[in-house]
Amino acid sequence: MVEKKITDIVIVGAGPAGLTASIYAARAGLSAVVLEELGAGGQLLSIDNLENYPGFPDGINGFEVAYSLQAQAERFGAVIESDKAVSISVNEGNSGDSRFVVQGIQDSYSARSVIIATGAKPDPLPVDGADALVGKGVSYCATCDGNFFRNRDVIVVGGGDSAVADVVYLSRVAQSVHLVHRREALKASPWYARQLEGIGNLVTHWSCVVSDVLQEEGRVSGVQLNNVLTGETSTIRAQGVFVAIGTRPDTKWLSGIVELDESGYLVADEGGATSVPGLFAAGDVRTTPLRQVVTAVSDGALAAEAAASFLASC
């Protein structure tokens, strides 16, 4: 039996936090393996124009940032594996070599330290039957799927920055965009809110929630709305429903292993250290007052440096 190589750092997640962590780890002379179920980039892949990333006055496409981060990580020697982590075991008595074993769907990975950078996933639309229509008109990624609805009618559900960004993008390809928000005003930042001014094909529906997703022949044909103030119902006919109502951390597989807060985020200090020595957190998956690409990148660098210091002390 061939003994598997033990990696210095296994990084779970290849979003901006995970990829940055791998860059800093590899540059520090540590072996780094990044596990990513989907394409490298995380939520960067859903950003058409990243306008608040320092150094790009006109913004930059999220795909471009993701590609550059991956190329940079691989240039310094990080290895990106197409796999999904499903569990992690901690060898409490082993402070050195194989302290952690991360079990993936494809393989298992022994490591001296681990950085969790799995980010957060979109909250599902809380409507019966909506999940079955994902890929059939319901989408959680406007930049991924928006072009399929060129010159058609679409609906965006949500009122935060992500929802507004979706509206702006979709207004350029769709015939009409209906924005549905359960409040009387946007939650989005003032700068984002101003982006809606002057969009001629936008229709807003305030104080409304989606109570049903309508379908014909197995595809979305519209939604039914319920006004939360008056109780009145109405119907919007559309072929696409883009959901942007929030995110939740991908941490169920870590329950009982490491401390999580009441919302499921990994509790971590400024350097990313968690309640388990040698286990670090970076990006949207951790407790933090701000979840942006720029903070995820910073988290990744800090977690890698903290992991390197931990390994040096073992």
Regions found by a protein language model. Name each.
Residues 15-16, 39, 120-122, 160-162, ...:
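Residue-level detector of alpha-helix initiation sites
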Residues 3, 7-76, 152, 164-190, ...:
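Beta1-alpha1 glycine-rich phosphate/pyrophosphate-binding loop at the start
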Residues 73-103, 108-111, 171-269, 309-313:
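A Rossmann-like FAD-binding core segment of flavoenzymes
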Residues 6-8, 82-83, 150-152, 207, ...:
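Phosphate-coordination loops involved in phosphoryl transfer and adenosine-cofactor binding
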Residues 80, 116, 140, 204-206, ...:
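A structural signal for the hydrophobic beta-strands that form the central parallel beta-sheet
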Residues 121, 126, 132-148, 245-295, ...:
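FAD-site-proximal beta/loop scaffold in flavoenzymes
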